[in-house]
């Protein structure tokens, strides 16, 4: 996804592929040795980390059975795509950046641009597929359990590559301008205005809009469920504090005769403290049926309280039980709010990283072909925009896998070579 053709004039690209900036032509003699060394180290480190990170994700899914599900198949396919970007595209892009000119010939240039557009577009569309899968899972959890099959995942993955091919192939079939190959030292994508609109909207702007809509709805659905849980907790707490359940009405009295009088379980501790009752029945001095309950107070003392059977039902809610329920309700409410904050944070990281990496590139890619010679892009800024887009292939495994505890456990096994021993 080279946005800037190093050291060149004002040509452009669309989806992931080189474009050039306006200004004076910079020859290869202007590239210093220190620039080449520093740039090589920086880009080499980025490429190495991208290869290692995505390879670990693929290995974790392949070796750990608990990770082999439909959701992780999409993440694994994303890692394979980003691995292809890191292995097939980034080395040539780094060479182009370090030398400040294209030295591999026109055929290799065409192949480089096609791979660049194909892999980067597919990577972006994989993010859409993951968002779509999550949207279905959270908005239709019952029915989607049966629909969430490997076949559906394969269909989504195939669709991302198909769209990538449809965007990357047209320039090779002639959808370009005569000026695209006029400079042998530059490797640029088609600057045709129609292709620029077609490629930028197909590779980024439409997927961006889709992801914003999907993650917006995911957030609303998640927040609705969380707040519904909070309301249930609050209602349960209120019922515990203020509600009363009537005492049971046995069909027979102690002596076996049918009785219409209610039994009461009302307990008061004269000394105060928390109470816990365990009932038994015996005969009173006047012949009335009495229920004896053993009362355990906080002070470990015991007393027996006779309860006359004539009395009507009287609610009893021990203070310690009420306080415990209040504490539980408050804890659940805090957990629910914490889940909502985590949801906001996760979705913010996903969308924020995607927009930060790709939006600058695609703004420039869409605008520059229409500016002709009136627009000027500083060389350094163009290089930063190019590699900011490429760095998304490094960040994707961090966002979608390394924050996941199941993946973390699999990575630890890989590091400790537990899979090798098995």
From Swiss-Prot:
Its main location: membrane. It is found in: Cell membrane; Cell projection, Dendrite. Residues 60-73, 133-152, 217-346, 404-422 are cytoplasmic. A motif (DRY motif) lies at residues 133-135. It is a multi-pass membrane protein. The gene is HTR1A. Gene3D superfamilies: Rhodopsin 7-helix transmembrane proteins. This is 5-hydroxytryptamine receptor 1A.
